[in-house]
Amino acid sequence: MLHAVLLCPYSKLIIASLASSKAITMIKNENASCGSNIRLVVAKNYMNGSREAGDYMAKKVRMKSEAILCAATGNSPTGAYKVFVSEILSRNNPPEKIHLLKLDEWGGLDMDDPATCEDYLQKTLVRPLQIPATRYVSFQSNSRAPVAECQRVQDWLAIHGPIDLCVLGLGLNGHLGFNEPADALIAAPHVAKLTDQSLAHSMLSTTRKCPTHGLTLGMRDILASKSILLLVFGASKAKQLKRLVTGGVSSLFPASFLSLHSDVQCICDEAAAALLPQGVFQKNKD
């Protein structure tokens, strides 16, 4: 396993401004050149990376008695969630103490549609950990008032936040949740327009409906998290990971804003890391 830490001297100042300002409604295109605080861990393959990620999640959650875990969906975190559940249950850590927050959701689908993020999280985390409804905060996919639904999640975060650990995947266009590339990124939970790329996601292959919109946490919510875990696996994400590590900060690649956060762990496999510069890595002594 390989490991690297990339540093940016301005990150703490910038991230504090983004996370604490209640007046922020948009995060503008910075196009700034900056190093990164991202700790990069390269595992041999998906299985090894998932094991590393699941262990990391369990360690972070055990650090706080009532941790808020924000969970992404999709292929990238599935293996990590299995390891995480096993770790939590085997070490007698009461899962009822965990607050689970859904990162995003497909709007316009029934809640029991197998394509929803709801269905995914119920199967991978909620039911295995027996997380009670009082500790699970979920965008309702079938809400007839999606703006009010986003406000409900925002109000909950204002009272209970910030997120302790936010688990993310890296979109093919650099999106985080449904925060898609744009001239400006919305800070708060919001209704998002779905791109053609998002609508082509494999999760939707099982649905009979076409989602009409996305519901997602905003960039401020993500960046206000105490810790962030980014999972990047497979050769199809190699260009995106290279852009994240070597490129500047721009709203046209939303994931680049993670480089401004002071505690981001990125776990990837060798296939995803194939295009990274040789000088990025040094051997992990652990």
Residue locations for each model-derived region?
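ATP/nucleoside-binding phosphotransfer catalytic cores, i.e., glycine-rich phosphate-binding loops
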Residues: 220, 224-286
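Class I SAM-dependent methyltransferase SAM-binding "motif I" and its flanking Rossmann-like core
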Residues: 173, 177-219
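A glycine- and small-aliphatic-rich helix-loop capping segment at beta-alpha/alpha-beta transitions
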Residues: 83-94, 117-119, 181-191
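N-terminal glycine-/serine-/threonine-rich phosphate-binding loop
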Residues: 26-69
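Ligand-binding beta-strand-loop-alpha-helix segment within the catalytic cores
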Residues: 27-37, 95-166
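Glycine-rich N-terminal segment of FAD-binding domains in flavoprotein oxidoreductases
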Residues: 63-89
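Glycine-rich beta-strand-to-loop/alpha-helix junction loops that act as flexible
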Residues: 71-76, 168-172, 233
